[in-house]
């Protein structure tokens, strides 16, 4: 992960080490802040926003990895994911076994080029690029 962040910082085309948050993204944060379930799910939403892959707007990880990173149980992550999915804040795309891609709305948060938003995993519900090829370069996060 550190290597990925250093590569992003050194290549100005990758928008550096920041995530763009749009008006709709700030509205999402305010919406999540309105109820108890939303408030506790904000750390997961912000972690995903911070680590989305610029090419597809998703994080590929297993739930245990997310739990370890956020210092909570896997069942808490599962509860937060279900809540965020029910609020249309993220799309869950099964990858293999317990590993999923978690995609955020590119009109809320984004790291890549503006022209690639139409091919974001949140929009297409799959990991593809603008040529229709399955995205194989995506950074995967695992607990092992």
Give, region by region, the residue ranges found by the protein language model:
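Alpha-helical interaction segments
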Residues: 7-16, 35, 70, 92, ...
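Alpha-helical structural elements
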Residues: 13, 17, 21, 40-42, ...
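Winged-helix/helix-turn-helix nucleic-acid-interaction surface
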Residues: 2-5, 79-144
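Short recognition helix of helix-turn-helix/winged-helix DNA-binding domains
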Residues: 1-58, 64, 141-144
């Amino acid at each position: 992960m550190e290597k990925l962040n250093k590569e992003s910082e050194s290549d100005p085309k990758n928008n550096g080490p920041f995530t763009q948050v749009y008006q709709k993204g700030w509205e999402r944060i305010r919406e999540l802040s309105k109820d108890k379930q939303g408030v506790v799910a904000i750390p997961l939403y912000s972690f995903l926003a911070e680590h989305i892959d610029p090419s597809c707007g998703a994080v590929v990880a297993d739930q245990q990895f997310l739990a370890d990173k956020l210092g909570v149980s896997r069942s808490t992550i599962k509860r937060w994911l279900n809540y965020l999915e029910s609020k249309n804040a993220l799309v869950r795309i099964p990858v293999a076994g317990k590993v999923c891609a978690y995609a955020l709305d590119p009109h809320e948060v984004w790291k890549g080029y503006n022209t690639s938003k139409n091919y974001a995993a949140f929009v297409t519900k799959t990991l593809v690029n603008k040529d229709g090829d399955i995205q194989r370069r995506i950074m995967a996060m695992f607990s092992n």
